[in-house]
Amino acid sequence: MLFELARWLQQFESLFGLFNYLTFRSILAALTALFLSLWIGPVLIQKLSQFKGGQPIRQDGPKMHFSKAGTPTMGGSLILMTVTLSVLLWGDLRNRYVWLVLVVMLAFGAIGWYDDWIKLARRDPNGLKSRWKYLLQSIFGLAAGLFLYFTADVPAAVTFYIPMFKSIALPLTSISFVAITYFWIVGFSNAVNLTDGLDGLAIMPTVLVACALGVFAYASGNTLFSSYLKIPTIPGAGDLIIICAAIAGAGLGFLWFNAYPAMVFMGDIGALALGAVLGTIAVIVRQELVLVVMGGVFVIETLSVIIQVTSFKLTGKRVFRMAPIHHHFELKGWPEPRVIVRFWIISVVLVLVGLATLKVR
């Protein structure tokens, strides 16, 4: 909205031409989301505290988590609210990718909200039944894939690329493209949700990955940079840096309240939405495999659950003391802050490795 106003005012004052620069608007988007989060956060937390009982705690979980009982949840609504407002203010609302990512974020956020509401209303830590959750996620994931495939305006937008191997480019059929899009959106949505089990554990890797994806989006949308870096040129993808910056700002604002010991939990409303956004942006800028590297913490958490469940069903034995794997380290005696910070460190390293692929091609 403000971007459109600035474009109109540019005819009267050249200073407003600053708003044509994505880098300038991305900084404004990040700061707007950050300050909105810090401003709205205390009020929202007070409102969420009115839900009696707060976040239900798993009875089979680590005993130290029982002290978290009563902590308000659904704090992810703060992130979705501030990201949406920031993007509407500073984003180019004529860009279809901007609208797609916003719709995906709000759609998966709605699924998460319903899941959280069931947990609170029924005092059931399991929430919405898995089959219904996956059905709803699948509908939106497939819809996003179909939209991206049939609105693609360049061959690069529907081609699969292997990082560091510029000569490998695999054209995708409609079925394979939609399948990959579905898997990345739904997969990362649930991966971030599985990671969100400790105070601040999921949000910092999300912020880091969002910042890195913003770099890829900016480069992909710029013909000069994408040609130099030998990454696919996707017209219009550059505007996604606004969303990535808004997520970074909102995420840091949320972390202010979610840092150990947390005043509020993200809930599925935030985790499912943010994971879906990361997956969607990675698909748009054709960096699916790079996301697997940069989001390695989310991938490891998910694999630990898959390994645990598979092992127990086949052999009756558990590989980990508890899954997801962050609980395994808790039960080994690691204090919660140590687990969190070490996972953050791993995430920083993996994001740097992902960014390094920009030059290693």
From Swiss-Prot:
Keywords: Cell cycle, Cell division, Cell inner membrane, Cell membrane, Cell shape, Cell wall biogenesis/degradation, Magnesium, Membrane, Metal-binding, Peptidoglycan synthesis, Transferase, Transmembrane, Transmembrane helix. GO terms for biological process: cell division; cell wall organization; peptidoglycan biosynthetic process; regulation of cell shape. It comes from Xylella fastidiosa (strain 9a5c). Catalyzes the initial step of the lipid cycle reactions in the biosynthesis of the cell wall peptidoglycan: transfers peptidoglycan precursor phospho-MurNAc-pentapeptide from UDP-MurNAc-pentapeptide onto the lipid carrier undecaprenyl phosphate, yielding undecaprenyl-pyrophosphoryl-MurNAc-pentapeptide, known as lipid I. It is found in: Cell inner membrane. This is Phospho-N-acetylmuramoyl-pentapeptide-transferase. PANTHER family: PHOSPHO-N-ACETYLMURAMOYL-PENTAPEPTIDE-TRANSFERASE, PHOSPHO-N-ACETYLMURAMOYL-PENTAPEPTIDE-TRANSFERASE HOMOLOG. Belongs to the glycosyltransferase 4 family. MraY subfamily.
